[in-house]
UniProtKB/Swiss-Prot annotation:
Gene Ontology biological process terms, A to Z: cell division; cell wall organization; peptidoglycan biosynthetic process; regulation of cell shape; UDP-N-acetylgalactosamine biosynthetic process
Pathways per UniProt: Cell wall biogenesis; peptidoglycan biosynthesis
UniProt source species: Myxococcus xanthus (strain DK1622)
Listed PANTHER family: UDP-N-ACETYLGLUCOSAMINE 1-CARBOXYVINYLTRANSFERASE
One example GO MF annotation: UDP-N-acetylglucosamine 1-carboxyvinyltransferase activity
Coiled-coil intervals: none
Active site per UniProt: C119
Modified residues (2-(S-cysteinyl)pyruvic acid O-phosphothioketal): C119
Known catalytic reactions: phosphoenolpyruvate + UDP-N-acetyl-alpha-D-glucosamine = UDP-N-acetyl-3-O-(1-carboxyvinyl)-alpha-D-glucosamine + phosphate
Gene Ontology terms: cellular component: cytoplasm
Protein name (database record): UDP-N-acetylglucosamine 1-carboxyvinyltransferase
Length: 420
């Protein structure tokens, strides 16, 4: 098992490139099930979660591989001989594995998918996925920890999500593209990754309108064809790199991003005192030695993303003043707070709200990552802390960040990966 070792105090400078978006790559890889033939995807990040999705697809009979360990190209080949089952030993490690459910029942008429696992952040149920598939005519049973869905032919219908769900929107959208007739989806997630999936499906021959808004209309088609597509940049990784510049008092250009996808974060960084400029398809963050406290409320896109909450908390822990951070998306998403306390942060949790009183400095200490974004938060805090910080259980980090320690090192951080 690896750990990340950081010696803090170095201001970051230079240029770094964002990798492809994990949260776009996973549903797009699953969408390959909707067509016979080989789909080719570029700019696919080398992440543990991507490797898990490829393994899920191989388990079902697909030819799903990365071209090599050093390339960003993945290919998924599908023929008619698919075993439509995603087993527990894989799905338990990554809840996004449930994204194969919609494509399987739409294309092959049946699916058996284990109930999902992944990060230990609240309940994150899949009831809205199942509600949507039922509205399209699927017969669904929960048996021995598995979702079993069958349908001779899905039929278009109206799906009104009770709560906004990104993976639920994606799963039902993938099912509806092969349903007979028109499907209207309401209260949909508006994340860029949903819009990206719709773009890929339309390239395959689907007829989707409205993705990126709360109302999506889909005209079902008889079949789809394989596709070639480059995955959009990861706005959360890019945001984490901008916060790394901010917390270190540095000057960093994050290249190959989509600036408009990051408006909510950029607004908060500017409010805190950073200078953020757009340079082509990149964002530059130049930060003073100490920033001002800002309040943060996580909401669905286009609001402030929950996946950046832990990173901003690390930044606020060394800002001037008091910050109030309200988490409205997931319960139990303050698990990084006790570890930040170990570094000297002054944070009080009051239900879904954290009150962060900025301190002048942090001190290095051994800490433990509890989930994906918490691991990034602790690394960011370690960049600012005086002395040595050891972050253990970084397998969480590898689920969603492509060689983050190498990117930070190239910007001047004293950071390395070691065997724990």
């Amino acid at each position: 098992m690896d750990k990340i070792v950081i010696k803090g105090g170095q201001a970051l400078h230079g240029e770094v490139q964002a990798s492809g978006a994990k949260n776009a790559a996973l549903p797009i890889l699953a969408s390959a099930l909707l067509a016979d033939g080989t789909s080719t995807y570029r700019n696919v990040p080398a992440l543990a979660d991507v490797a898990t999705m490829l393994k899920v697809l191989r388990t079902m009979g697909c030819d799903a591989e990365r071209d090599s360990e050093t390339t960003d190209v993945c290919r998924v080949g599908v023929n008619g001989h698919i075993t439509p089952e995603a087993p527990y030993d894989l799905v338990k490690t990554m809840r996004a594995s449930v994204l194969v459910l919609g494509p399987l029942v739409a294309r092959f008429g049946r699916a058996r998918v284990s109930m999902p696992g992944g990060c230990a952040i609240g309940a994150r149920p899949i009831d809205q996925h199942l509600k949507g598939l039922k509205a399209l005519g699927a017969d669904i049973h929960l048996t021995e920890g598995y979702v079993e869905a069958t349908a001779k032919q899905l039929k278009g219908g109206t799906v009104n999500f009770d709560v906004i769900t990104v993976t639920g929107t994606e799963n039902v959208m993938m099912a509806a593209v092969l349903a007979k007739g028109r499907t209207l989806m309401e209260n949909c997630a508006r994340e860029p990754e949903v819009e990206e999936l719709a773009k890929v499906l339309n390239k395959m021959g689907a007829r989707i309108e409205g993705a990126g808004t709360s109302s999506i209309t889909i005209e079902g088609v008889d079949g789809l064809k394989p596709v070639e597509h480059a995955i959009l940049p990861d706005r959360i990784e890019a945001g984490t790199l901008l916060v790394a510049a901010a917390i270190s008092g540095g000057d960093v250009l994050v290249k190959r991003v989509v600036p408009e996808h990051m408006d909510a974060l950029v607004e908060k960084l500017r409010e805190a005192g950073c200078t953020i400029t757009t340079e082509g398809s990149g964002l530059r963050c130049k930060a003073p030695q100490r920033l001002d406290a800002v309040n943060i409320t996580t909401t669905e896109h286009p609001g402030f993303p929950t996946d950046m909450q832990a990173q901003l908390m690390a930044l606020m822990s060394v800002s001037q003043g008091t910050s109030v951070i309200s988490e409205n998306i997931f319960e139990n998403r303050f698990m990084h707070v006790p570890e930040l306390h170990r570094l000297g942060a002054d944070i009080t949790i009051q239900g879904p709200t954290a009150v962060v009183k900025g301190v002048k400095g942090l001190s290095g200490a051994p800490v433990m990552a509890t989930d994906l974004r918490a691991s990034a938060s602790l690394i960011l805090a370690g960049l600012r802390a005086e002395g040595r910080t050891d972050v253990s259980r970084v397998y969480h980090l590898d689920r969603g960040y492509e060689r983050l320690e190498r990117k930070l090192s190239a910007l001047g951080a004293d950071i390395r990966r070691e065997k724990a």
